[in-house]
Amino acid sequence: FLGAGVSMSANMPSWKDLLKGLMGEVKQLKNPTLDAFKELSSHVLEECGDSNLIMGRYLQTAISLYDNKSVFSELIQKYLYNDNNTSPLLMNLARIVQHKKVNEVITYNFDDLLEQNLNNLGLRDSVDYTSISKDAEIKGHNTLPIYHVHGIIPKEGPVDTVVFSEEEYHKRYSTAYHWSNVEQLHALTRMHCFFVGLSMTDPNLRRLLDAAKVMN
């Protein structure tokens, strides 16, 4: 299980820094409905603008009012990556995967840094992996699955829809048979799991751990 600490080891922005960067970009977007929303919400942002929850909900609403819905993921893609997205931690994780020491990888991060490091270290031929971010992609794969349970925004190529706001996050985790919950519980109940870059403060992750304990 990979968390934000893995990505931040490679100079990825923290969650708060990402939100603040996106806030600046959204302020530059223009259309009449969005402009009206920004004017109405300006006071709330002045009072509570440093709250991750408020910023996340503001961004979700603002993008829903914009004509081009894919712009949100494209903005995240712009802010995620720099010229040197690697670290000793990521390279070591890639080598562990190379030696077939893991059955699957579950990541909560939007980025594809693990895949990039596998490719950059010349391990693509020895590690046949599949990046999975949708239910339909699970069926029939005979490769190492890398599950992006909150969506994936690769450095290059088309961007995915991601779980960004707290509202979307809670909605997904309240759906017991959502593919991401099923895959996480499968790993927690049938495999020895290692958690890297996670603070374990996420209540939904702790809930899954409690559920796995009961199931075992």
What are these model-predicted stretches?
Residues 1-216:
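Conserved catalytic-core helix/loop/strand module for nucleotide-ribose chemistry
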